[in-house]
Amino acid sequence: MDLYSGYINQLIEELAALPGIGSKSAQRLAFHIINMPKGRVEKLARSMTDAKEHVRYCEECFTLTDAEKCPICSNEKRDHTTIMVVENTRDLAAYEKTGKYEGVYHVLHGAISPMLGIGPNDIRLKELMQRLQGEVDEVIIATNSSLEGETTAMYISKLIKPTGIRVTRIASGVPVGGDLEYIDEVTLLRALEGRVDL
């Protein structure tokens, strides 16, 4: 027997389907939303709809933005000769929090994982190679230190080496299997500063 009515159950189920939200958190959020003033609920719903309709990938680095180019790629003060390659937008945000990286990014939206059927053509490697046609001096590979992240890093390194562009990998300090989005800013900064040539 269901404890709650259909609308409450539906809201809980939809919230629980989000990553990182378990059934208890979904229940807590659902009750919070139900108890919010109607205007706030409408504003929340509108902001979700607006984000879904207007947010897209930056035409240059493929992070999420609501413009053709994201604020980082549009910023002329950034070092456009250095590209940091990350697996997802959350990893980009983690490095931006350090406030020390002055280059630009390239978001792959995944990592090579033969076990999951994800190959090089399933992530944004072709677009990365197209970006290297411009004036690029260094590519910093900042994929996660998981098996998939390491596989992706080695694949990218082999692709770029023949171009003569310097390819580096963030240093250890990031635990094996660790996701960058959960690493503190100091550790990320040390990993960036201690990067090694591949």
Give a label for each model feature.
Residues 41, 117-118, 149:
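Alpha-helix N-cap/helix-start motif
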Residues 9-13, 27-31, 42, 46, ...:
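Solvent-exposed alpha-helical segments within well-ordered globular domains of core cellular machineries
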Residues 26, 75-143:
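Extended interfacial segments that mediate partner engagement and assembly in macromolecular machines
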Residues 28, 43, 56, 68, ...:
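Residue-level signal for pocket-adjacent positions within structured domains
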Residues 102, 129-198:
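Long C-terminal interaction/binding lobes of large macromolecular proteins
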